[in-house]
């Protein structure tokens, strides 16, 4: 099963975490739409979320979609 998580920070940054069976990738953009992190691989959803905390302190999950 795959999960796509959309997140937003207090300062306007957005992020998408894609969790698959064998990999987790992170895409993060600043408030102007400039890519900060482009498909960076991580071991887990938690590792990707911890990386987001280095960019901004407050992130909110706005959507979670599960697919097969």
What feature does the model see in each segment?
Residues 34-68:
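Mixed-charge, Lys/Arg-enriched low-complexity segments
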Residues 4-6, 36:
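Local beta-strand/beta-hairpin segments that build beta-sheet-rich folds
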Residues 2-3, 12-13, 20, 57-67:
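Short glycine-aromatic motifs
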Residues 9-12, 17, 45-47:
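Intrinsically disordered, low-complexity serine/threonine-rich segments
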Residues 2-4, 29-30:
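Short, well-ordered helical secondary-structure segments
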Residues 14-36:
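Short aromatic-glycine-(Arg/Gly/Cys) micro-motifs in beta-strand/loop hairpins
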């Amino acid at each position: 099963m795959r999960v796509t998580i959309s997140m937003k920070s207090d300062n306007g940054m957005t992020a998408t975490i894609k969790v698959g069976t064998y990999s987790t990738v992170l895409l993060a953009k600043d408030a102007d739409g400039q890519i900060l992190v482009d498909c960076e691989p991580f071991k887990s959803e938690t590792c990707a979320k911890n990386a987001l905390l280095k960019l901004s302190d407050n992130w909110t999950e706005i959507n979670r979609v599960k697919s097969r």
